[in-house]
């Protein structure tokens, strides 16, 4: 289990991400990169594009 904040958890092997509105969500990747839109994320070693819909290396 990964502890995000204030009792919010995500499954092991995932990453906690927080949306701009303060809502936590679980990125399905270990050490994932959270996108600014608060809904998407990328694998470790990749980053989100400006639209937060594509992952770039």
From Swiss-Prot:
Any GO MF annotation of the entry: cytokine activity
GO cellular component: extracellular space
Cystine residue pairs: 4-16, 10-26
Keyword field: Cytokine, Disulfide bond, Secreted
Listed Gene3D superfamilies: Granulin (2.10.25.160)
Main location: secreted
Protein name: Granulin-3
Entry superkingdom: Eukaryota
Entry keyword Methyltransferase: no
């Amino acid at each position: 289990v990964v502890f995000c904040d204030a009792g919010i958890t995500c499954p092991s092997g995932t990453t906690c991400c927080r949306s701009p509105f303060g809502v936590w969500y679980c990125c399905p990747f270990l050490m994932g990169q959270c996108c600014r839109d608060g809904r998407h994320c990328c694998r470790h070693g990749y980053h989100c594009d400006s639209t937060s819909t594509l992952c770039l290396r």
